[in-house]
Amino acid sequence: EFDSVHGRAVGTVTHGDDWMDVGSGKIHMSRERDPANIPHAAHGVDIVLECSGKFNSREASAAHLAAGAKKVLVSAPCKNADQTIVFGVNDNLLTADTDVVSNASCTTNCLAPVAKVLADSVGIEAGYMTTIHAYTGDQPTLDSSHKDLRRARAAAMSMIPTSTGATKAVGEVLPQLQGKMSG
C-alpha cells in the first residue's frame, strides 16, 4: 500500500493469489516465466505491456500473441519489432496490423524529438550525443560481484560510462538521420 515514488495508495488495496484490486475491480496477475503460458485469451487481453526486460526480440515477445494477446508494446529496444515508435516523432506510422511495437529506449525517447525538430527546421549533417543515465536494476546498491567490474560498484557512488544504442535507434525512427548520429 506504499510506494517510494507515489506514496500511500489512495483507497483500499486487496489481493488474492492471482489478483489484486486497487479500488476499480480485480486485476489478474500471473507469475509465469513463459509468456506463451499466460492466459491472455481467457482474460480478453488486448495489449500486453512487455516491461520485463527479458523479451526484447520480436520472436520472444510474440509469445504473448500466441497466448491470445492482440498486440504487444515492448518498453525497450526490440530486435525485429514490427515498428519502433517514439510518440510525437513517428507514431503516425502505426497501423492496425502492427502487432509488436517497440517504444525504443528512454535515451531514444529524449533524443529523437529534439533531433526531429532540428532536422525539420535547419537540417542535420552529423550529430554527436552523450547520455547521463540514472542507475538501473542491473547495478547493485552496494559493492557486489558483476560480470562487468565497473558495474560491480555501488550505483549511487559511481558514474559508470556505458554504451547506448540510441544513435542507431534514432535512425530507425527518423530514417533521414540514419548513419548521421554517433555517441
Where are these regions (language model features)?
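N-terminal Rossmann-like NAD(P) cofactor-binding subdomain of oxidoreductases
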Residues: 1-141, 145-152
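Charged docking surfaces used in two-component/phosphorelay signaling
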Residues: 138-183
